[in-house]
Amino acid sequence: MSILSTVGAIAAILAGLLHVFIFYMESIAWTSEKACSTFGMTKEEANNTKEMAFNQGFYNLMLAIETLFGVCFMFFGNVIGKPLAIFGVLSMFSAAALLFFSSPDKRSAAIKQGTLPLIALILLFL
């Protein structure tokens, strides 16, 4: 594996771990003070949206699993690894781009969510 692919894989791993953390915040800790503060909502808003957040959290977990499995396959030389990792980080970046353009008040979160997947995409394609 080339140095660029290795650094891209590391960025993909970090993006995957970030999405595992997002899963935790959305699916497990949604009504906690930390989650309410992070997502800028009241406890009542969190309680009213916990089913939606639970579902969205699992979406983020599946993106993380897809990406992390892809990187594992890459490191073991399986040809399916790189495309799987690329598709995972492409999905992560696409979601971040959608958030960036559809919700101007959430652009900071979109940049945080999309930077590592974008770095991984660029380096994995080189």
Task: Annotate each language-model stretch with its function.
Residues G114-L126:
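Small-residue-rich segments of transmembrane alpha-helices in multi-pass membrane proteins
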Residues F69-T115:
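Transmembrane helix-loop-helix
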